[in-house]
Amino acid sequence: MFKCPERVSIKKKEDILDLPNLVEVQIKSYKQFLQIGKLAEERENIGLEEVFREIFPIKSYNEATILEYLSYNLGVPKYSPEECIRRGITYSVTLKVRFRLTDETGIKEEEVYMGTIPIMTDKGTFIINGAERVVVSQVHRSPGINFEQEKHSKGNVLFSFRIIPYRGSWLEAVFDINDLIYIHIDRKKRRRKILAMTFIRALGYSTDADIIEEFFSVEERSLRLEKDFVALVGKVLADNVVDADSSLVYGKAGEKLSTAMLKRILDAGVQSLKIAVGADENHPIIKMLAKDPTDSYEAALKDFYRRLRPGEPATLVNARSTIMRLFFDAKRYNLGRVGRYKLNKKLGFPLDDETLSQVTLRKEDVIGALKYLIRLRMGDEKTSIDDIDHLANRRVRSVGELIQNHCRSGLARMEKIVRERMNLFDFSSDTLTPGKIISAKGLVSVLKDFFSRSQLSQFMDQTNPVAELTHKRRLSALGPGGLNRERAGFEVRDVHASHYGRICPIETPEGPNIGLITSLSSFAKINEFGFIETPYRVVRDGIVTDEIEYMTADVEEECVIAQASAELDEYDMFKTPVCWARYKGEAFEADTSTVTHMDVSPKQLVSVVTGLIPFLEHDDANRALMGSNMQRQAVPLLKTEAAIVGTGLEGRAAKDSGAIIVAQEDGVVEYVDSYEIVVAKKNNPTLKDRYQLKKFLRSNSGTCINQTPLCSVGDVVTHGDVLADGPATDKGELALGKNVLVAFMPWYGYNFEDAIIISERLIKQDAYTSIYIEEFELTARDTKLGKEEITRDIPNVSEEVLANLGEDGVVRIGAEVKPGDILVGKITPKSETELAPEERLLRAIFGEKAADVKDASLTVPPGTEGVVMDVKVFSRKDRLSKSDDELVEEAVHLKDLQKEYKSQLAQLKVEHREKLGALLLNEKAPAAIIHRRSADILVQEGAIFDQETIELLERESLVDLLMAPCDMYDVLKDILSSYETAVQRLEVNYKTEAEHIKEGDADLDHGVIRQVKVYVASKRKLQVGDKMAGRHGNKGVVSKIVPEADMPFLANGETVQMILNPLGVPSRMNLGQVLETHLGYAAKTAGIYVKTPVFEGFPESRIWDMMIEQGLPEDGKSYLFDGKTGERFDSKVVVGYIYMLKLSHLIADKIHARSIGPYSLVTQQPLGGKAQMGGQRFGEMEVWALEAYGVAHMLQEILTVKSDDVSGRTRIYESIVKGENLLRSGTPESFNVLIKEMQGLGLDVRPMVVDA
């Protein structure tokens, strides 16, 4: 058994916490969405279940017919993920939903087929139309409440708040310059503003007294003594003062008490008054009460409606239904659990489950928000404005949630159709059933649209395992409901203090998307509300415990967090009284007694790919960014080699990316070949785990996916052991490049501008050779003119050209092909119009003949050559045209298949019985087991399970068994559920195989008779023009391949394999590459592998010690000798081992030439670009260069016959054919275009011939 090489490290202690599963973001989210494996009654109100419960029940307009949702059921996939890719179909399961319909004729229940739903593979990807895709998680502004401030042109600071729901209208409240608060509903309608006081009344606070009571505490004061009188002057009334007899109003609520008013009140014999404590005439609420044009609930509602819908009659019914619809109808306005959580947290409301389930707006929310806004305006220290770029105010929508939102809109469409069908149904002629009124089209089309067209559903980057892993961990601020890259400012893109341990500050693309597309940090998790959490060790009484606490960004604000590098003694206490810590996003030297938490690892700051860069702490951030991005572009090599200098993350990255095969359980390897590994389970050797290996498959980016076994028969394996290597892995570790002996020196000017010089030895050893696989596809269809045919018999093609084609017209496997060679021969019927006049005449005389077909063969495109490695043919079988022999053969195949199916089913039953026996035999039942439908007691509580009872349970399905919750029931459920799924899968496989034997490939597109896929593999060696890079952002292009004899060599005669330019180091400030060179040299000489984890790597002194130990020069520099002359170079040169990668930007894909080719339709100028077989544009500046040298004839040629002079092109062709060399140019087409454009403007411009 191959074991991963143990890496030497200087870390004294391993990380307290292991990395979480790196693709958990995807898998967990989709699992919660579908809740596969759960019984219908056990499903929580989340994901797909939540959407169905939201939309249903649907009632007809007269409420006589009601359609209720009961449960949904998911089938099993028809094909495996690999088979789906091969056939070009979607990896999905059927969705069946059980409905109950109640109408005047009674109650009917029915299970309705609602189409298919794509499911996720074990690796966290989807297969849509045969291509692997990833749904990227979206970062968006969290629903909830945000308080903001902006400066008015007059210099005043104006405060505002915004309540953002998950779905529905935004509510905004803004202070104006006069200290009045105005409410805006939906940002689009900013001009329609409503005074906050009017809005409060419209919510149901009718009188001024009610409003004052909400905002102020009210005190009752007596008016008996003179000192009471004096104390009340200037206070604000909290209620109207009314004469009980005459109903005369002496003072209104909200009015300021003057001496005159108090005398009138005293004269009327009023004994006490209600006073608003803390209110004065300048208080915003009192000001707004005075300004408010309305005085009652009804008037406020009408005013609100008038401002919202000017021009429409403001009736009370309309106004009330509008406000209800805007904020109090859960279908139209939904804060979501997240929005409610954020709002309650900010305003100090309770956070229990009951409160969090209230998803619409409450009156208390508006009042609470206005109170907070006023406190903010008054300068209360306990209030604060929100930073919208803080991760407490930004959340992540993962796959499950994104698809849930699309399902909601699909089912909402269906709801309208169902309601219409209910109303239009003719009950007299037919009975109504759920299947007759439900249309699954809405849901299916929305899902199809999302997976194939959404900006967040992306074609997976599959260049290498790291690219795949990073793509699944990516966070995007773009996409529907997100930002727009043109409008996104600097603040959104910038690194924020709250990103620490949540979003990687380094890994982001260069260019327009910088900062908008980011990556999750290595330890980050996403919580139930969608906020990113990061783990910390809890510190209690100065002792750093092993207790781990996951914290969101807002919780972290209140904690003092020490760095992971802080030194601890053997009792896990801080060694020093002061250490570096963070508090509210600022770093400072903290007293260790105040520290509350500690980082779990220094690498929690960065993402996985950035964590793969050794000596990251010595690299400039810009170069580290390039290093992270370029590791994703490394091509998997033919011969892989793990890095001598690693960081310790290589094994984990390879494992979680799904590139390698890992043992699921302990056991012994029983059988190994290049296609399959069989492991007998340790606890029950009769049960086998079978692992299928992927052999020479094409990845999304054309690279080769191939897995090779690492184990041998008889090897004992434990859970998590590596059984097989994949692409770009070496003994279970990531291996993207090669360890190369490098010298930093100039060499005859060939490494100018970062160019790289390599030794021919690397080419001979196939060090940087990679395999590319191209897929070519051809379909034969049934056309109007007749059937297309795949055949070897192609008109007007010599036998020599057809040499590699088999009898069926398909190229043989192993054939070497080059551009223009035929891969699949195909003939298509010709239409009459395509025939030449003489052909038509001949056909009229001699009648129909075989030549009425044209050649439509698939040929190798330019720039591609290689070996045909695989051919796949899919075809339909015609039931009616089968011969007797074929029917007999079919019957034999079906019989064999049935036999195999029965034996596998029997094996499953045996395994199932053994599992049940292992769990239950001779055990005591902790609770009774009841049959759900018949209510019979199958097993009494306390009974001992014997063989008979186990056989009884074995025959029952999981749905029918009922037992009180206990550990035994949980395990029993798992066993029954996995057995039922296995039986279902076996049955589906049997039916699929039987269908294939009878009908061939029935899932081909409509009209397709036959489909052929040809795979051509090409071996690409490293050549001049290929791009290479190290892990520190040090990239360059291969400029020269030097014979080994000419390369500089060391004193011991060893030649250098690569020469890099030393000037690439100082200005780029990526010193990591130099340290890697030294450490790599020392480790290679010692024959060890080392790991230098991010921020806790080898110190410089330790590297020098290792160099000296290995007898290498102390300064890391050696004298080199020129391979050409044998003379020693003057200065010492840094020599050592660097891990260099070959990137996917290969010159073979980019180099291009054209003699003649296609021309643009309008301008008649050659097209541009390799894909269009375009030319090289000779632009304005190039013309100036030729003009400067006065090369008139060349200029004329370039601007006319080589470009858009149509008649001149024809004439020059004729003259070249005749052997003349005459250039008679005509009018360039661009001149005619100019004239037409001017005529389009109404100018009569015509070229005229004028006699001289």
UniProtKB/Swiss-Prot annotation:
The record's annotation in SUPFAM superfamilies points to: beta and beta-prime subunits of DNA dependent RNA-polymerase
The protein here is known as DNA-directed RNA polymerase subunit beta
Pfam entry (one): RNA_pol_Rpb2_3
What are the protein's UniProt keywords? DNA-directed RNA polymerase, Nucleotidyltransferase, Transcription, Transferase
Q: Its catalytic activity?
A: RNA(n) + a ribonucleoside 5'-triphosphate = RNA(n+1) + diphosphate
Q: Which GO terms describe its molecular function?
A: DNA binding; DNA-directed RNA polymerase activity; ribonucleoside binding
Please list the GO biological process terms of this entry: DNA-templated transcription
